[in-house]
Swiss-Prot record:
Residues annotated as domain UBA-like: 14-51
PANTHER family found in the cross-reference section: DCN1-LIKE PROTEIN 3 (PTHR12281:SF31), RP42 RELATED (PTHR12281)
Modified residues (Phosphoserine): 12
A Pfam family annotated for this UniProt entry: Cullin_binding
Organism: Saccharomyces cerevisiae (strain ATCC 204508 / S288c)
Protein name per the record: Defective in cullin neddylation protein 1
Residue ranges constituting the DCUN1 domain according to the UniProt record: 70-266
Highest taxon above the source species: Eukaryota
Gene3D superfamilies, per the entry: Cullin, PONY binding domain, DNA helicase RuvA subunit, C-terminal domain, EF-hand
Main function: Required for neddylation of cullin components of SCF-type E3 ubiquitin ligase complexes. Neddylation of cullins play an essential role in the regulation of SCF-type complexes activity. Does not act by preventing deneddylation, but rather facilitates neddylation, possibly by acting with HRT1/RBX1 to recruit the Nedd8-charged E2 UBC12 to the cullin component of SCF-type complexes.
Record text on subunit structure and interactions: Interacts with the cullin CDC53. Interacts with ubiquitin via its UBA-like domain. Interacts with RUB1/NEDD8.
One MF term in the entry's GO annotations: ubiquitin conjugating enzyme binding
């Protein structure tokens, strides 16, 4: 893979995004930062926003920008290989993921979805989003892309900031249309993946099992976005049942469901 910015160890994720955005758009880094910040550092959303506001539309890039990127033939061939009826749809994505060496249940798939700017996995991916993303990462072949995702997978295991970003991103990605909450069973499936010992946020296994048991015993059928996000902070601060019992502050701004969990643990002592 040539000039893969993901592998840089001396730059923060934000700085990497600014450099990639600036390289593609040729705009001032301050402008890059502005668009990235207001799009929560998702480079594909920021690019769409930039081209809409500064130039016209993202899809008009080729006709409007003086020097549009020329994508390598190998890269366009990868895209063409996976499309169905000119769409990179969910079936295309599943096949692509499998040929990268993963499956939909792997957390690395979330890294891929985040990189490509997916809001929902069921929505077709635009040609420009696919090509521009891999072009910015210096990837033209499946082999290049495999190395890129391996690098992100390692980052997910080692970088707490990136892990938190992917964890928070996952909620909206798995949320069904026209709903505000996810089913508890689905939440549990993903928590079992995110809170494996090899990832940055570690807690005693008994604590995670106690949380699952509490949800089931109390008939909690759905999980809100606030609960999803705050649970990660909760486990960072209180990695053991004993620490919760001894240090938990009921006056702090935790969701009510976490207060209930604390009371449940107290009753079991």
């Amino acid at each position: 893979m040539s000039n893969n910015k993901i592998k840089r160890k001396d730059a923060s994720p934000e700085q990497e995004a600014i450099e990639s955005f600036t390289s593609l758009t040729k705009c001032d880094p301050k402008v890059s930062r502005k668009y990235l910040q207001r799009n929560h550092w998702n480079i594909n959303y920021a690019l769409n926003d930039y081209y809409d506001k500064e130039i016209g539309t993202f899809t008009d890039e080729v006709s409007t920008v003086a020097h549009p990127p020329v994508y390598p033939k190998e890269l366009t061939q990868v895209f063409e290989h996976y499309i169905n009826n000119n769409l990179f749809d969910i079936d295309s994505l599943v096949k692509f993921i499998e040929e990268l060496g993963y499956n939909l249940e792997d957390l690395a798939t979330l890294c891929l979805a985040h990189l490509l700017g997916y809001k929902k996995l069921e929505e077709p991916l635009k040609r420009e989003d696919f090509l521009s993303t891999w072009f910015m990462q210096g990837c033209s072949t499946i082999s290049d892309m495999q190395e890129c995702i391996k690098t992100l997978d390692v980052k997910l295991h080692e970088d707490l900031q990136y892990f938190t970003q992917i964890y928070n991103y996952a909620f909206n990605l798995i949320l069904d249309p026209n709903r505000k909450d996810i089913d508890t069973d689905e939440g549990i499936q993903y928590w079992k993946l995110f809170f494996q010992p090899e990832y940055p946020v570690r807690m005693e296994p008994d604590l995670l099992e106690a949380w699952f048991r509490f949800l089931r015993d109390e008939g909690k059928t759905t999980i809100s976005k606030d609960t999803w996000r705050m649970l990660l902070l909760f486990f960072k601060r209180y990695p053991t049942i004993q620490k919760i019992i001894s240090d938990y502050d009921e006056t702090a701004a935790w969701p009510f469901i976490i207060d209930e969990f604390y009371e449940c643990l107290q009753d079991q002592q």
